[in-house]
């Protein structure tokens, strides 16, 4: 004769009060988590990694602007570098060209990429701005975490030998392209630079959360472009996945093309050229020397 078995608890036949209690507890837990998430506030006062430690600031004086805390590191590897910060004075009437940088982190994953804008003055001075996650010490970036108020946003103003150099000379997998932008048309380059600088100052006063979908390098570039030239960049998946941007760049005539899109992509790769730079010449001139931008067509 088998021993009597204790009846199993059927969750669908629990007393009404118990079901209600479990549901209420779960509901309140979700509400608490949402409220806690929404209560998080971004800050400019944390223990930042060295290359994100200082935040740039622009001081306007008529047509002149002084940009403080421009990064000018000398990178030997991603962890070995000489730290240097400089102030740079520019004349806003002398903005001559804008350059667009597209860095694929891994060529096998073409959706994921980083975008940078670089401003060239009539005297050849170039200053780049990389819109990034502002990392704390010991912190690593992950796109999923970027959805949940885990990183602040920063506009990193830097020399090209720093912000482009570290990508082309120190990263083994990444592939970096350099295009001359024609996104705004003549005369609007100054307004684009001013838009960037004013947003930089705003972030210094009111920090913001980075968001993997809504507040990234590329979504901010598009906002700046459309602020200066409304409707210039249409809505597209490539804004969320910047690695897909070459076709939208071609379709909307946003960069100078040198042949077909495939030929332009191949000719715009600057990694090997950057690796051969000896340091005796200007880095920006060196990576552009064989690009033939002046012979390209829109």
Over which residues does each language-model region extend?
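N-terminal Sec-pathway targeting helices
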Residues: 10-27
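Activation targets extended, charge/polar-rich intrinsically disordered C-terminal tails
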Residues: 21, 184, 195-298
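Charge-rich, low-complexity N-terminal segments
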Residues: 23, 32, 59, 64-65, ...
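Internal alpha-helical transmembrane segments
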Residues: 30-43
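Alpha-helical transmembrane signal-anchor/signal-peptide segments
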Residues: 40-57
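A short, structured loop/turn motif at beta-sheet edges
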Residues: 60-64, 120-124, 184-189
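Glycine-rich catalytic cores of cysteine/serine-nucleophile enzymes that process amide/ester linkages
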Residues: 65, 76-176
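A structural motif
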Residues: 160-200
């Amino acid at each position: 004769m088998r021993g009597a078995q204790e009846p199993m608890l059927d969750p669908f036949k629990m007393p009404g009060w118990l079901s209600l209690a479990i549901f209420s507890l779960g509901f309140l837990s979700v509400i608490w988590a949402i409220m806690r998430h929404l209560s998080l506030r971004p800050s400019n006062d944390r223990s930042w990694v060295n290359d994100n430690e200082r935040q740039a600031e622009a001081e306007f004086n008529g047509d002149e602007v002084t940009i403080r805390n421009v990064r000018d590191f000398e990178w030997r590897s991603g962890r070995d570098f000489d730290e240097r910060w400089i102030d740079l004075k520019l004349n806003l009437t002398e903005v001559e060209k804008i350059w667009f940088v597209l860095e694929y982190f891994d060529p096998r994953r073409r959706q994921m990429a980083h975008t940078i804008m670089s401003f060239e003055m009539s005297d050849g001075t170039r200053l780049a701005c990389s819109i990034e996650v502002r990392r704390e010490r010991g912190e690593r970036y992950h796109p999923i975490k970027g959805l949940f108020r885990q990183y602040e946003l920063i506009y990193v103003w830097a020399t090209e030998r720093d912000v482009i150099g570290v990508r082309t000379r120190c990263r083994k997998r990444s592939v970096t392209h350099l295009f001359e932008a024609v996104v705004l048309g003549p005369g609007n380059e100054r307004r684009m630079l001013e838009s960037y600088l004013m947003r930089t100052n705003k972030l210094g006063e009111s920090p913001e959360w980075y968001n993997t979908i809504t507040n990234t390098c590329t979504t901010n570039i598009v906002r700046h472009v459309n602020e200066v030239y409304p409707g210039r960049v249409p809505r597209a998946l490539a804004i969320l996945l910047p690695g897909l941007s070459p076709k939208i760049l071609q379709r909307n005539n946003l960069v100078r093309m040198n042949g077909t899109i495939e030929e332009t992509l191949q000719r715009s790769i600057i990694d090997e050229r950057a690796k051969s730079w000896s340091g005796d010449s200007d880095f920006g001139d060196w990576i552009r020397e064989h690009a033939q931008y002046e012979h390209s067509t829109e």
